[in-house]
Curated annotation (Swiss-Prot):
Pathway: Cofactor biosynthesis; thiamine diphosphate biosynthesis. Residues 256-270 have a biased composition (Polar residues). It holds the Pfam family ThiG. It comes from Synechococcus sp. (strain WH7803). The gene is thiG. This is Thiazole synthase. It comes from the Bacteria.
């Protein structure tokens, strides 16, 4: 994506502007109070909500919808827990209704997850593409969660997805950017925003994603499971801002040899 800095450096997804490039989740927090504090400290403007867990009032999700000020934060319903394209499409439709119930009448966003493997939680590329094609036809703003596959990312862009969301490493693993080279290829070839999702464990990894040109990151476990979630949320926000500024500034070229920082002429003994 374009690295030219602007005075109002906003991210645009599906025609909606976001000042914050840190997206967060709502799961895994010890309690809703810590979630609220963390969202506030993160300065995030979009959070994911697992539609199935809210609908079934799963553990930790009771009262979730009432705990968030939806006039300030944009809801990103996700299809977590769906194992097939058909299931994901159905849950996406429920998510759109959930957003409307929260007062976001025109919210068509969906984070598309199709994950048949409950052990490794790796997304199904075929099911994701199938579901994405149908949801785009239905007018959804689709943000698909994918393996860091440059060919799949481009195909999803071509069918009309609003972003692509390659994983840094498996969900909740905290392994960081294990797929950095592939993510770099996705960024280089993308004409839509690239959001690195999953695997980020510490702020330096979030910063690294932005430094390499990612447009945003989505971080949940690293905040929710930290010893002090609100403090970690603030640290992530600072790291994302720093990473974005570093990308805009442009890093010095990597060299095989040393390059002196002081002049080599005009020395005392010359």
């Amino acid at each position: 994506m374009d690295s030219t800095p602007t005075s109002t450096d906003t991210l645009v997804i599906g025609g909606r502007q976001f000042r914050s490039r840190l997206f967060t989740g709502t799961g895994k927090y010890p309690n809703l109070a810590l979630m609220q504090q963390s969202l506030d400290r993160s300065d995030c403007e979009m959070v994911t909500v697992a539609v199935r867990r809210v609908q079934t009032v799963a553990a930790g999700h009771a009262g979730l919808m009432e705990a968030i000020d939806w006039t300030k934060i944009w809801m990103l319903p996700n299809t977590a827990g769906c194992t097939t394209a058909e299931e994901a499409i159905r849950v996406a439709r429920l998510g759109r209704e959930l957003a409307r119930l929260a007062g976001q009448e025109h919210n068509t966003f969906v984070k598309l997850e199709v994950i048949p493997d409950s052990r490794h939680l790796l997304p199904d590329p075929f099911g994701t593409l199938e579901a994405a094609e149908q949801l785009v036809k239905e007018g959804f703003t689709v943000l698909p969660y994918i393996n860091a596959d440059p060919l799949l990312a481009k195909r999803l862009e071509e069918v009309g997805c609003a972003t692509v969301m390659p994983l840094g490493s498996p969900i909740g693993s905290g392994q960081g950017l294990r797929n950095a080279s592939n993510i770099a290829l996705i960024i280089e070839n993308a004409s839509v925003p690239v959001v690195v999702d999953a695997g980020i464990g510490v702020p330096s990894e979030a910063s690294a994603a932005l430094e390499m040109g990612a447009d945003a990151v989505l971080v949940n476990s690293a905040i929710a499971l930290a010893g002090n979630p609100p403090l970690m949320a603030e640290a992530m926000a600072s790291a994302v801002r720093a990473g974005r500024q570093a990308f805009q500034a442009g890093r010095l070229p990597t060299r095989a040899q040393a390059s002196p920082s002081s002049p080599t002429t005009g020395k005392v003994n010359d």
